[in-house]
Structures are given as C-alpha cells and as structure tokens.
Swiss-Prot record:
Record-level GO BP terms: rRNA base methylation
Zinc keyword on record: no
Catalytic activity: cytidine(1402) in 16S rRNA + S-adenosyl-L-methionine = N(4)-methylcytidine(1402) in 16S rRNA + S-adenosyl-L-homocysteine + H(+)
Gene: rsmH
Highest taxon in the source lineage: Bacteria
EC number: 2.1.1.199
Protein name per its UniProtKB record: Ribosomal RNA small subunit methyltransferase H
Family: Belongs to the methyltransferase superfamily. RsmH family.
Organism: Protochlamydia amoebophila (strain UWE25)
Gene3D superfamilies linked: Putative methyltransferase TM0872, insert domain, Vaccinia Virus protein VP39
SUPFAM superfamilies hit by this protein: Putative methyltransferase TM0872, insert domain, S-adenosyl-L-methionine-dependent methyltransferases
Length: 316
C-alpha cells in the first residue's frame, strides 16, 4: 500500500538548525519525529551524524518519515514509543549518551487534518485523540465515564478554561440522555454553553479539546520525565531543544531548564525559600523563548503559539 503524503510544515525549522549548528552531533535523538521535516534538515546539515534515533507514537508518521529519510537509511533508527523512553531505546542499542535531543510538542498537521484521529473539533470524527493508536484510553472514555469533578479538574488544570465547571456539568447532564462519541457531538454540545465571541480570544472549545488530548496522552507527565533526565544522558557541549505550544508545556520546560542551570537548589520543595548550593549542569542558550517570525506565522498559522527553549550541558 503506498504511503500517503501529508503536507506538514516543520515549525521554527531555521531556528532548530541554528540551535544545533555549533554541536558535533554523532548521536542525535528526535523525540517527536513526525513526518521527518526537522530530521531531514538536521541530517543535511550534520553529515557527521552516526546515529539518528527518531521516536514517535504514531506508526503512520514513522512510515512517512522512513520513506522521506531513505537517503540516510544507514544512519537512522526509528522507534515507536514516547519521547520519555529515549533512554530505554538508547540502552537497547548499546548507547549510553547523546549529543543532541529535539522535542517538538505540537500536534502535527497530518494528525489534526485526519478526522478519524479525533483531535480537531472542526472535523467530524470519533472522539479519540490517542497519539499512539494502540493506547487504551480515549477522549470518549473520559467524556462518558469520568465524574463531573474529575472532568472539571482536567478542564481547569490542562485547558485553563474559565468555565470549567459549566463544561463538566453540561457534559455529565447530556451523557445521561445519549453518549458523546464524536468530535461534532462534543462541539455542538458545548458551543451554546460557551457562547464564544471571536473578539474575546481563544475559542473555549480549543481549550477543552486541548485538555482532553493532554489527559489521554499524559503529555505533561511524560514531558516532566523527559526533561528531568535529559542531562544524565547528554554529553558535555551537547544541547537539548524543546518547542512547546501552550503555557503548561512551556512552564515545565522553563522551570526544568532553569533548575539545571541554577547554582541553587530548594531543599524542602518548591516555594520553601530554603536553598543550598549546587553545581549547575547546564547553561541556558536563550533566556527568553524564541518565537516564530511574522513571515512564518503568516505561512503557517499553527506556528503562532510556538516557544523554543535551548540548553547546553556543561563540562562535568
């Protein structure tokens, strides 16, 4: 069966190339391979690469990337899984360190544009939202079985939606009559409750769908796992670069990278005000996040909320 082509623009492509330009990349990990756009650019600019480990939860994306990167088939190794498993995959092939790590946390256009994946409220499809099609939990499971309290909590914590109570209550009342099984079912149910005015910012449906997607895929949990152990495997002079797309992700990345670059450590937990000295393991390449230029946003509106942070491992 031929592999379909999906037009997908890699976000902040030039900035990613620049981020790794000073580094000798012998072993590189792409934690979110997608269609292989970033991979293609990095492999073109770094002929010294001996191993390019590409990880993605979506087997369809891996198939597309494998075809796209055929020119470098002697160097690439593709693994289906979550980016927080990078250390497991490294050890499986006999490696204990890496020179670079890239993670792009955005949902790719090819996933958003496939109605059957259930990521977008603008396209009718099953209420799924699994990055890994083999995962057990779906958005429909959450919407139809979780309590009003738990639904409200994820809408508040993962969507930062002001009307989280109303959204949860509306869903629970509606599902007593009929199950909510499609993206259109959920969107049509919540639209009247929100009465959104386009002049007043983000569509609340965007935030509700974001919250469900984060919950289904445990996105924030695995992001924390990734960043907290990255510097254990990064060689001195190596770099980690993360592209995030909403404040929850960026907050985790910012805090973890700043902690790695800090010479202080809170001894009894966040906010305690009690510190002890520690040796920094990294330096921040950019203290403020890099954002897309107006030209890129115009060409690819989905890039508008991207934030790019980079850190470099210090000598031991």
């Amino acid at each position: 069966m031929p592999i379909p082509f999906y037009p997908h623009r890699s976000v902040l492509l030039e900035e990613v190339i620049e981020a790794f330009q000073p580094v000798q990349l012998k072993v590189f990990i792409d934690g979110t391979l997608g269609a292989g756009g970033h991979a293609e650019a990095i492999l073109e600019h770094h002929p010294e690469i001996e191993l390019y480990l590409g990880i993605d939860q979506d087997p369809n994306a891996l198939n597309i990337a494998n075809k796209r990167l055929e020119k470098w088939k002697q160097k690439i190794l593709l693994k289906q899984g979550n980016f927080s498993q990078f250390d497991i995959f490294l050890k499986e092939i006999g490696f204990s360190s890496m020179d670079g790590l890239l993670v792009d946390l955005g949902v790719s256009s090819m996933q958003l544009d496939q109605p059957e994946r259930g990521f977008s409220f603008s396209k009718d499809g099953p209420l799924d939202m699994r990055m890994n099609p083999e995962g057990k939990l779906t958005a429909a499971d959450i919407v139809n079985t979780w309590s009003e309290h738990d639904l409200g909590k994820i809408f508040r914590d993962y969507g930062e939606e002001k009307k989280w109570r109303l959204a949860a209550r509306t869903i629970v009342q509606a599902r007593q009559v009929k199950q909510i099984l499609t993206t259109t079912d959920l969107a049509n149910l919540l639209k009247p409750a929100f009465a959104w005015n386009p002049k007043k910012g983000i569509n609340p449906l965007t935030l509700i769908f974001q919250a469900l997607r984060i919950c289904v895929n445990r996105e924030l949990d695995v992001l924390e796992q990734l960043v907290s152990k990255t510097f254990d495997y990064l060689k001195p002079g190596g770099r980690v670069a993360v592209i995030s797309f909403h404040s929850l992700e960026d907050r985790i990345v910012k805090n973890e990278l700043r902690l790695a670059a800090s010479d202080k450590w809170e001894t009894t937990g966040l906010g305690s005000g009690l510190f002890r000295d520690k040796k920094p393991v990294a330096k921040l390449v950019n203290r403020k996040p890099i954002c897309p230029h107006e030209k890129e946003i115009k060409e690819n509106p989905r890039s508008r909320s991207a934030k790019f942070r980079i850190a470099e491992k210090l000598e031991g």
